[in-house]
């Protein structure tokens, strides 16, 4: 009873704090109020409180249930929200410049936690005895790496999608201008790196001409930060996803006698891994660097949700123990 009450208190505290912080982040991000230092710092401290609240929630559930809290969809969503909070903490300690990563991590954490604590999953918060397939020491290793990988890849993909939107708004012609052909638009979209390098050089020239605070310069700095963080966060998420898939193979061999069973969850995880491997290849290989890598990220963003929720919605395969239909 005590653990259950404590769990509810921590859930409400973390959700209330992050709900209060979210409008502050959107306001400071859109209006660009750098002079309101205390206002922005207070929102950062709110996310720190949320991080410790979710951490306490997970530890409380761990002690109460007697196993690592990653046995169903509700617990994995809370852990995913915690993963976004960790990514936010990284940007919190980077005080050298204004970081737009916060505008992605804060709403992601609140939306995921809000969905987990909503009425859609009202039967799942109660902790239950693990099914035999999950009673293994590989549970913590495999599932935690996969969820951390999902969180990092989702965050990096959202940054790339934001980069894609900014680029699309720049190159898309007005609907009344018939002189600009669709082919030119597609060339701009699929060869973004070349376009970005040209614009950055142009902005540097403007900076030398005392136009460093112009609208184009501000936009260039935004694009540079989005590209910087998306590549590094996706690289980290790719490592987590790789370790998660490898640990799953070892666990599957111990449980079912086969390293790979082409289960729907395994298949979609492999497809997701392949897409982000292509993205990293594009970013690190100069010969194919002209391809618009954020488009690959956008595809990967959709694949992650298919991999994460697809099996749970269908309720099929070896990973159907945490599905909606099973509850």
From Swiss-Prot:
It comes from the Eukaryota. InterPro entries: Cyt_c_assembly, Cyt_c_biogenesis_CcsA, Cyt_c_biogenesis_CcsA/CcmC. Keywords: Chloroplast, Cytochrome c-type biogenesis, Membrane, Plastid, Thylakoid, Transmembrane, Transmembrane helix. It holds the Pfam family Cytochrom_C_asm. Its main location: plastid. The chain crosses the membrane at residues 13-33, 46-66, 73-93, 101-121, 146-166, 226-246, 262-282, 298-318. Disulfide bonds: none annotated. It is found in: Plastid, Chloroplast thylakoid membrane. One of its GO terms (cellular component) is plasma membrane. It is a multi-pass membrane protein. One of its GO terms (molecular function) is heme binding. The keyword Membrane applies. GO terms for biological process: cytochrome complex assembly. Required during biogenesis of c-type cytochromes (cytochrome c6 and cytochrome f) at the step of heme attachment. Belongs to the CcmF/CycK/Ccl1/NrfE/CcsA family. HAMAP family: CytC_CcsA. May interact with Ccs1. This is Cytochrome c biogenesis protein CcsA. It comes from Draba nemorosa.
């Amino acid at each position: 009873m005590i653990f259950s009450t404590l769990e509810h208190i921590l859930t409400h505290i973390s959700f209330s704090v992050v709900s209060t912080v979210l409008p502050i982040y959107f306001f400071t991000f859109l209006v660009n109020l750098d002079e309101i230092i205390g206002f922005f710092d207070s929102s950062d401290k709110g996310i720190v409180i949320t991080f410790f609240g979710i951490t306490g929630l997970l530890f409380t559930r761990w002690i109460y249930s007697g196993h690592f809290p990653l046995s169903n969809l509700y617990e994995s969503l809370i852990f995913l929200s915690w993963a976004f909070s960790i990514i936010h903490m990284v940007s919190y300690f980077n005080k050298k410049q204004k970081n737009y990563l916060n505008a992605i991590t804060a709403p992601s954490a609140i939306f995921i936690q809000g969905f987990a604590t909503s009425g859609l999953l009202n039967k799942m918060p109660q902790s239950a005895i693990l099914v035999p397939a999950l009673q293994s020491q590989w549970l913590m290793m495999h599932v935690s790496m996969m969820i951390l990988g999902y969180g990092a890849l989702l965050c990096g993909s959202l940054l790339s999608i934001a980069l894609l939107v900014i680029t699309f708004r720049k190159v898309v012609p007005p609907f009344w201008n018939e002189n600009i052909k669709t082919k030119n638009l597609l060339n701009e979209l699929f060869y973004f790196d070349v376009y970005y390098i040209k614009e950055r050089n142009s902005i540097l020239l403007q900076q030398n001409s005392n136009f460093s605070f112009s609208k184009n310069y501000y936009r260039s700095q935004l694009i540079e930060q989005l590209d910087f963080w998306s590549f590094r966060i996706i690289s980290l998420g790719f490592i987590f996803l790789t370790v998660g898939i490898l640990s799953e193979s070892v666990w599957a061999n111990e449980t079912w006698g086969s390293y790979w069973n082409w289960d729907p969850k395994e298949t979609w995880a492999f497809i997701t891994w392949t897409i982000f491997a292509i993205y990293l290849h594009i970013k690190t290989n100069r010969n194919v660097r002209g391809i618009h890598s954020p488009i690959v990220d956008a595809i990967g963003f959709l694949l992650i949700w298919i991999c994460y929720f697809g099996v749970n919605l269908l309720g099929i395969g070896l990973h159907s123990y945490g599905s909606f239909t099973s509850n």
